[in-house]
């Protein structure tokens, strides 16, 4: 038991999934095919075949394949190229002749005869490949494609609150496809129903219905509520009583039961829905209809006599005369439609039109300015909603439409149907009558996630469609007798479209690579922004807010601060995305009151009708729920229900939070705002050179480390055969299936955010490892657990004002021991170009540069690895040819001394910029193809090849030793059938005899079973050749040239490691949103100290806790103090040799951790003591989110460690030695150093560049800017009346260009007379006024008086 085990206070019942599975599965479905994302072959099949349009030829798709990438992932980063693989497709060109083949129904040939068929494999372009960690390498930079949350295809119903005038809500419906035109329906203030296509000008819905081929009779049948009136024997008309039709109606006649003649309700009463249902329940089925009410109603069907004669056509409005004559007409029943509430019918009556008018009107709206015909309008309308080429709902949209309207269409039908439109209109009409509810657009059942595979699908399709258009153009001019398929393909089109997406899309982002947590969080991010998404400027509060359906799917805590809050979210730790793009979360089945271990995933739609209890529900040993009434969620409301009705249970209390939030212990005790900050600031933590896992963790640290890809994990179980600083070789122990896995460690590799990626081996030679074991730690990882910071002894105390306003006081011991020292890599690039005057040259011989700045260069002019460099040092010496000019006497002298070179070139070397100093850790030299490698490039190539040869030799040595060990087992104990000194024929072969023979000669010994030995030798030779072949390919890649930009001959990259120690001004934080800036580093002897003389490491302000309401940090401090002192106690007992007490103490610590106790009970006393040695630094504990230790458990551990259960200690002032007045909260807390380093922010300059317009210093460190005397500084001098100082500041000391030169001359001459000129900023202001047609000129006092007098006379009109 080599690794330490955290003390858990809960049980992990459900293991965590692959944390970057979202990215990997989505891209895999694009490459190999999936449920919603089409594969590459499917997209080819949907675009091809491409015909020339004249029936002469057709280009068909046969198959495609992806090749192998030219370089590995790191090789692409080094060379600044894209990690991609070539895509090749086999296309078949079918050429048709003039004659035709086949016969139609009348014996006439119908199909053209095939004249020729030509197949060819064609290079279609390079497709970026996803790395094993779920990222893409584009132009040498790691990028992540962020998943996007968008509105799911389908129909949505809402009300338009913004356009409501009278207080009555007008409802709208919108059918949104995945690809194609939007169809909107809306009511105006007069209850007229309109529709829009793609948000263009609206038209009455009559036009759409007519275009769909509906007559008035069809409209009555589809949309109108028809009342059938029957004539009784006594000559009265009756109508069927339907409660929904009478809801809200004020009676205009007495309501009389037609069956009993009883008066049910008197005239004038208003019928509510409750009253109507009660009347129906009491037996009211038919009631008498007043003839006056039938007036102004419309006939829903032709009024036909008993003889079949049409008396009145359908759609006729009944008048007084019609009503009066009804009893005399020969009819016994009529079907009537009331205008009120039948919005579709009323719209048709107001805006009626013919089929042709409807088609032409729709065409004019969609394509204004064009002259339509009925045929073209029909084609356009058909293509808008009913053509698979232009309209696509996806299977998601079809499923949602089927579920909404109870339809049964197949999933493969992804275009609209007439039935979909009819159902939408009917549902909207019901909503306008206040029947039903609108959709919640923020419900996760109405929003789906698009991932990288879907984006690639779309881009690939766009590229192929563009390519198809080019193919058609090329076919028009092609000679089909000789043309080949490759001549019609432009392979750059597809690559350009995909490259444009990765380079310019808002969802293809520069990966946050500050630490492993920031990487994994970026890959699990879900954005509502981007193409087709929301706009941060117009997104309202509702869409940003936490929704009930986010439970277990989207983290309610982690989101950015600022303008994008709520629009960018993170997946919850257990959440996954199903094949339709909906987010699902896992639940355990509950059957007959028993919580089982069977797990299922539910989407937000599936969860609505389920009864779900919490993970913390009380159960007995067999899993049965103890309580009779259980607190559950049903339809997103909290209710108490009987345990027999519970259907599901949460898998874990932490399933509602994201990866970053799950790393915060005691999260439940923090305010939500501070928890948000804590989640975000963990991603800003800088990896330290000596990382330390937190004593108080959550148990998620190991899962995050593995999921991030920063560690090296064993692919298979085996034995570690070889280890050095860069390589680990693991081999199998199996005799039947032998393999060798070689792992290469990253050393001083630069991340996207200039942090150092450095891996360290954690196994030893001969160690047995299992599949999934960690072989090497990465940055910010210790023993396979995430380690973003350090555990410090903290005191919450005000100390001489230095921790005012969240400032932090640090002990000098922290700096001395390099606890928060980090290494950052800065990359510098020098490009050698071929100029029109000749090529640039890299050399150490740079004229005009002092030798002290060239000390780190080798003989080739490039910095040596390991050299310490300071600001101003030359990293790469480079000279550039310069044009000829008149030669000065000094240049003539240089020419005479140094030759022609002295005047022909200028210095263009790469210098280390100001503010940077460090050690050169790596140099890369890239040379253009076709140029012979010389100098340092050959040396670097040789080093790389030697490193590969060393790896190869180690693998071959492992293989050889293994094979010869098997051969030895086959030979020993057998009788030799041949003689090979010192073994004679007939001798029994022994190990001693074999050792005297060279191993290469063992194959010559003949024994029984020689066939198995020959088979072993063949396996050995094959595996040997395979390893050699692999490394020969690697050698060729190393020796290969690089593809550089036009005109570039060579690129030299120099990487400098910069060491950042902790200093005042650096930003630090905890995990609870508690952040501050270091104000002072105090000598350890002046820091407050404990009774045993231990000084505290850090002092925090206690006032920062209650107002921020992040009490979790106090609980962490107390639990950390217990864990820290338990480690000290164990260490003391080990040093004393009191092993029995060590064992009893360890057992007492872990007594509530069932899994750990089971492991300890299986261990011997010696093994327990050996394990306890790993606890010297403290007993690591896991305070899981919502399942952490209670107060009594923390107090138990504090007492066990021999500390006050209050968590407070007596402190002494390190300066005076006096005891503080009261006890102080002291503990062990995990602190992080954030990447807001003071070295990156503060700079100074004495001289530098000026702005060309204002002649004032530039601003900011990036421009090497300086200080300018600004507006507020002028106010300060004005306030003191310092006129002369102000005049100097605004002129010669600022932007008076001429004055600056004159002052310099005056100083040189010893003259104290300064002459002030006009500041350049004043000239800028005058030019701006002139741009406004206001001329400003300088003039003397006399001229001013004369000009003002003339102006006054002109103004008076004299």
Curated annotation (Swiss-Prot):
GO cellular component: DNA-directed RNA polymerase complex
Keywords: DNA-directed RNA polymerase, Nucleotidyltransferase, Transcription, Transferase
Domain of life: Bacteria
Family stated for the protein in its record: Belongs to the RNA polymerase beta chain family.
Record's keyword annotation contains Transferase: yes
Protein name: DNA-directed RNA polymerase subunit beta
Entry GO MF terms: DNA binding; DNA-directed RNA polymerase activity; ribonucleoside binding
Catalyses which reaction(s): RNA(n) + a ribonucleoside 5'-triphosphate = RNA(n+1) + diphosphate
Transcription is among the record's keywords: yes
InterPro entries: DNA-dir_RNA_pol_bsu_ext_1_sf (IPR042107), DNA-dir_RNA_pol_bsu_external_1 (IPR019462), DNA-dir_RNA_pol_su2 (IPR015712), DNA-dir_RNAP_su2_dom (IPR007120), DNA-dir_RNAP_su2_hyb_sf (IPR037033), RNA_pol_bsu_bac (IPR010243), RNA_pol_bsu_CS (IPR007121), RNA_pol_bsu_protrusion (IPR007644)
PANTHER family: DNA-DIRECTED RNA POLYMERASE I SUBUNIT 2
Gene3D superfamilies, sorted: 2.40.50.100, 2.40.50.150, 3.90.1100.10, 6.10.140.1670, DNA-directed RNA polymerase, beta subunit, external 1 domain, DNA-directed RNA polymerase, subunit 2, domain 6, RNA polymerase alpha subunit dimerisation domain, RNA polymerase Rpb2, domain 2
Organism: Neorickettsia sennetsu (strain ATCC VR-367 / Miyayama) (Ehrlichia sennetsu)
Enzymatic class: transferase
Record-level GO BP terms: DNA-templated transcription
Catalytic activity, EC: 2.7.7.6
Quaternary state and interactors: The RNAP catalytic core consists of 2 alpha, 1 beta, 1 beta' and 1 omega subunit. When a sigma factor is associated with the core the holoenzyme is formed, which can initiate transcription.
Function per UniProt: DNA-dependent RNA polymerase catalyzes the transcription of DNA into RNA using the four ribonucleoside triphosphates as substrates.
């Amino acid at each position: 038991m080599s690794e330490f085990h955290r003390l858990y206070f809960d049980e992990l019942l459900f293991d965590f999934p692959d944390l970057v599975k979202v990215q990997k599965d989505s891209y895999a479905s694009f490459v190999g095919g999936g449920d919603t994302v089409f594969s590459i072959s499917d997209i080819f099949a949907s675009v091809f075949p491409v015909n020339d349009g004249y029936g002469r030829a057709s280009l068909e798709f046969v198959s495609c394949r992806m090749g192998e990438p030219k370089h590995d992932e790191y090789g692409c980063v080094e060379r600044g190229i894209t990690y991609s693989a070539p895509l090749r497709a086999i296309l078949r060109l079918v050429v048709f002749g003039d004659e035709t083949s086949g016969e139609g129904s009348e014996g006439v040939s119908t199909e053209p005869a095939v004249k020729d068929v030509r197949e060819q494999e064609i290079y279609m372009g390079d497709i970026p490949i996803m790395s094993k960690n779920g990222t893409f390498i584009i132009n040498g930079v790691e990028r992540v494609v962020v998943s996007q949350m968008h509105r799911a295809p389908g129909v949505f119903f809402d009300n338009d609150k913004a356009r409501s005038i009278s207080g009555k809500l007008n409802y709208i419906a919108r059918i949104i496809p995945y690809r194609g035109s939007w169809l909107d329906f809306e009511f105006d203030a007069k209850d007229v129903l309109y529709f829009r296509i793609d948000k263009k000008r609206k038209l009455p819905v009559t036009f759409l219905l007519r275009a769909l081929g509906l007559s008035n009779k069809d409209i009555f049948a589809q949309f109108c509520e028809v009342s059938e009136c029957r004539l009784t024997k006594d000559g009265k008309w009756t109508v069927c009583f339907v409660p929904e039709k009478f809801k809200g109606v004020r009676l205009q006649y007495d309501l009389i039961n037609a069956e009993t003649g009883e008066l049910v309700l008197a005239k004038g009463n208003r019928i509510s829905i409750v009253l109507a249902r009660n009347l129906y329940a009491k037996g009211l089925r038919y009631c008498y209809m007043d003839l006056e009410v039938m007036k102004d109603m419309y006939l829903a069907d032709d009024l036909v006599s008993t003889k079949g004669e049409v008396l009145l056509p359908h759609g006729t409005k009944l008048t007084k005369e019609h009503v009066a004559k009804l009893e005399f007409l020969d009819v016994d029943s009529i079907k009537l439609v009331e205008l009120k509430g039948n919005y579709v019918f009323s719209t048709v009556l107001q805006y009626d039109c013919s089929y042709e008018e409807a088609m032409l009107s729709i065409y004019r709206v969609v394509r204004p300015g064009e002259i339509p015909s009925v045929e073209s309008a029909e084609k356009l309308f058909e293509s808008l909603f009913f053509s698979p080429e232009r309209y696509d709902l996806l299977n998601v949209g079809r499923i949602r439409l089927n579920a909404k309207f109870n339809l049964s269409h197949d999933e493969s039908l992804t275009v609209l149907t007439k039935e979909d439109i009819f159902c939408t209109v009917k549902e909207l009409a019901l909503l306008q009558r206040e029947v039903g509810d609108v959709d919640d657009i923020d419900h996760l059942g109405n929003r789906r996630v698009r991932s990288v595979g879907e984006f690639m699908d779309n881009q690939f399709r766009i590229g192929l469609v563009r390519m198809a258009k080019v193919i058609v153009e090329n076919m028009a001019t092609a000679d089909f007798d000789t043309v080949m398929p490759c001549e019609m393909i432009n392979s750059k089109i597809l690559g350009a479209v995909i490259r444009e997406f990765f380079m310019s899309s808002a969802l293809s982002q520069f990966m946050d690579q500050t630490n492993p947590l920031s990487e994994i969080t970026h890959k699990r991010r879900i954005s509502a922004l981007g193409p087709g998404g929301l706009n941060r400027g117009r997104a309202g509060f509702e869409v940003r807010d936490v929704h009930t359906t986010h439970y277990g799917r989207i983290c309610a805590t982690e989101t950015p601060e600022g303008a994008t809050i709520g629009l960018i979210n993170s997946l919850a730790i257990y959440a996954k995305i199903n094949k339709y793009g909906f987010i699902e979360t896992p639940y355990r089945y509950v059957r007959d009151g028993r919580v089982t271990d069977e797990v299922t995933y539910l989407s937000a739609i599936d969860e609505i009708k389920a009864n779900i209890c919490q993970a913390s529900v009380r159960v007995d040993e067999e899993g049965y729920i103890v309580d009779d009434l259980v607190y559950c969620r049903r339809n997103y409301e909290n209710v108490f229900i009987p345990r027999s009705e519970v259907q599901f249970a949460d898998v874990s209390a932490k399933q509602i939070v994201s990866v970053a939030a799950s790393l915060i212990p005691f999260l439940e005790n923090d305010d939500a705002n501070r928890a948000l900050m804590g989640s975000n600031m963990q991603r800003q933590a800088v990896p330290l050179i000596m990382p330390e896992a937190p004593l108080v963790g959550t148990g998620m640290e190991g899962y995050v480390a593995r999921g991030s890809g920063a560690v090296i994990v064993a692919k298979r179980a085996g034995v570690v055969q070889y280890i050095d600083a860069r390589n680990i070789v693991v081999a199998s122990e199996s005799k039947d299936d032998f393999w060798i896995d070689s792992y290469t460690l990253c050393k001083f590799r630069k991340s996207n955010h200039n942090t150092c990626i450095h891996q360290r081996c954690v196994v030893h030679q001969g160690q047995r490892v299992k599949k999934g074991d960690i072989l090497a730690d990465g940055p910010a990882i210790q023993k396979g657990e995430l380690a973003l910071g350090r555990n410090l002894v903290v005191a919450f105390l005000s100390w001489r004002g230095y921790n005012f306003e969240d400032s932090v006081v640090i002990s000098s011991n922290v700096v001395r021991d390099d606890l928060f020292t980090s290494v950052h890599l800065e990359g510098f690039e020098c490009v050698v170009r071929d100029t029109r005057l000749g090529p640039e040259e890299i050399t150490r011989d740079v004229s005009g540069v002092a030798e002290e700045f060239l000390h780190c260069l080798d003989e080739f002019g490039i910095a040596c690895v390991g050299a310490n460099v300071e600001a101003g040092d030359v990293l790469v010496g480079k000279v550039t040819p310069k044009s000829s000019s008149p030669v000065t006497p000094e240049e003539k002298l240089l020419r005479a001394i140094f030759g022609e070179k002295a005047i022909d070139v200028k210095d263009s070397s790469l210098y280390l910029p100001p503010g940077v100093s460090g050690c050169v850790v790596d140099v890369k030299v890239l040379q253009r193809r076709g140029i012979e490698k010389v100098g340092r490039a050959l040396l670097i190539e040789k080093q790389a090849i030697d490193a590969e040869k060393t790896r190869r030799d180690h693998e071959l040595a492992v293989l050889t030793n293994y094979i010869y060990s098997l051969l030895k087992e086959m030979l020993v104990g057998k009788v030799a059938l041949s003689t090979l000194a010192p073994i004679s024929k007939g001798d029994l072969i022994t190990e001693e005899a074999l050792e005297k023979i060279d191993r290469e000669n063992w194959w010559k010994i003949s024994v029984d079973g020689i066939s198995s030995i020959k088979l072993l030798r063949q396996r050995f030779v094959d595996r040997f050749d395979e390893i050699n072949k692999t490394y020969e390919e690697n050698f060729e890649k190393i020796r290969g040239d690089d593809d550089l930009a036009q005109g570039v001959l060579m690129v030299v990259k120099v990487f400098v490691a910069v060491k950042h120690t902790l200093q005042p001004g650096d930003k630090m934080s905890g995990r609870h949103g508690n952040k501050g800036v270091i104000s002072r580093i105090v000598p350890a002897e002046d820091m407050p100290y404990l009774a045993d003389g231990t000084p505290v490491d850090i002092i925090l302000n206690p006032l920062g806790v209650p107002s921020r309401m992040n009490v979790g940090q106090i609980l962490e401090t107390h639990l950390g103090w217990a864990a820290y002192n338990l480690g000290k106690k164990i260490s003391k007992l080990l040093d004393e040799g009191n092993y029995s007490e060590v064992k009893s103490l360890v057992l007492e610590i872990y007594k509530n951790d069932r899994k750990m106790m089971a492991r300890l009970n299986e261990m011997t006393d010696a093994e327990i003591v050996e394990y306890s040695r790993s606890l010297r630094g403290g007993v690591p504990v896991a305070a899981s989110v919502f399942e952490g230790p209670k107060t009594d458990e923390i107090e138990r551990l504090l007492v066990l460690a021999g500390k006050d259960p209050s968590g407070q200690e007596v402190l002494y002032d390190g300066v005076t030695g006096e005891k503080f007045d009261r006890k102080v909260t002291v503990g062990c807390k995990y602190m992080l150093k954030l990447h807001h380093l003071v070295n990156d922010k503060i700079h100074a300059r004495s001289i530098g560049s000026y702005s060309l317009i204002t002649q004032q210093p530039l601003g900011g460190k990036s421009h090497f800017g300086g200080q300018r005397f600004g507006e507020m500084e002028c106010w300060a001098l004005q306030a003191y009346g310092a006129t002369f100082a102000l005049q100097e500041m605004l002129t010669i000391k600022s932007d008076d260009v001429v004055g600056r030169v004159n002052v310099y001359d005056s100083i040189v001459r010893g003259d104290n007379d300064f002459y002030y000129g006009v500041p350049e900023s004043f000239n800028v202001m005058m030019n701006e006024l002139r741009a406004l047609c206001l001329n400003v000129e300088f003039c003397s006092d006399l001229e001013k008086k004369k000009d003002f007098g003339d102006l006054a006379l002109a103004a008076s009109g004299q």
